[in-house]
C-alpha cells in the first residue's frame, strides 16, 4: 500500500444549494468512515468528477444523484480548488485507500424549485447519501461539518457569504 503522503487527492465538486430564503441545503450523512460524532454529521452535497467531465456538469449530476434536484441556476464558483486531507486513521478505508483526501471545486447554486422536488431517500439509481435534510443559515455550516473538512467550509462560506440573501 502507498504511503499516506504519496497518495493523490480525489477530484470532486461541492455544491452549496441556496433556496429563495437564502438558506443552504444540508444533509445528515448516512454513517460511513467520516462519522465522528452526532454533532458533526451534516454536510452539503459533494461528489466525484468522472474522467473528462466538466466540473459544472459533474456538480449538476452529483446534486441530482444525491437530492433528485434539477431546478437550479449556477450563481457563483470558488475560483480555486480547495483541498482537505482525511485523517490518517481512516485513510486506508476511505475510497479503498487510494486517496489522501479531496480536491474540490465549489459552486453556489440557486434552488429554483419547490421543496417537494428534494428526495434523499430514493435518489435516482443511487444509494442514499443522507438520512435527513434541512435548510440552514450559511454561517452555521462550519460548525456542523466533521472537523477535518471545516477549513474548506469556512472558505466556501467566506466566498459565498454575500449570496445568503432572500430573493
Curated annotation (Swiss-Prot):
Enzyme nomenclature, EC number: 3.6.1.-
A Pfam family hit: NUDIX
Cross-referenced Gene3D superfamilies: Nucleoside Triphosphate Pyrophosphohydrolase
Annotated InterPro entries: NUDIX_hydrolase-like_dom_sf, NUDIX_hydrolase_CS, NUDIX_hydrolase_dom, RppH
Residue ranges occupied by any Nudix hydrolase domain in the UniProt entry: 8-158
Gene Ontology MF terms: bis(5'-adenosyl)-pentaphosphatase activity; guanosine-3',5'-bis(diphosphate) 3'-diphosphatase activity
Key words, A-Z: Hydrolase
Disulfide bond sites: none
Cofactor(s) needed for function: a divalent metal cation
Motif (Nudix box): 47-68
CDD domains: NUDIX_Ap4A_hydrolase_plant_like (cd03671)
GO biological process terms on file: nucleoside phosphate metabolic process; ribose phosphate metabolic process
Cross-referenced PANTHER family: NUDIX HYDROLASE 26, CHLOROPLASTIC, UDP/ADP-SUGAR PYROPHOSPHATASE
Family the UniProt entry places it in: Belongs to the Nudix hydrolase family. RppH subfamily.
HAMAP family: Nudix_RppH
The protein's role, per its UniProt record: Accelerates the degradation of transcripts by removing pyrophosphate from the 5'-end of triphosphorylated RNA, leading to a more labile monophosphorylated state that can stimulate subsequent ribonuclease cleavage.
Protein name (Swiss-Prot/TrEMBL): RNA pyrophosphohydrolase
Species annotation: Rhodopseudomonas palustris (strain HaA2)
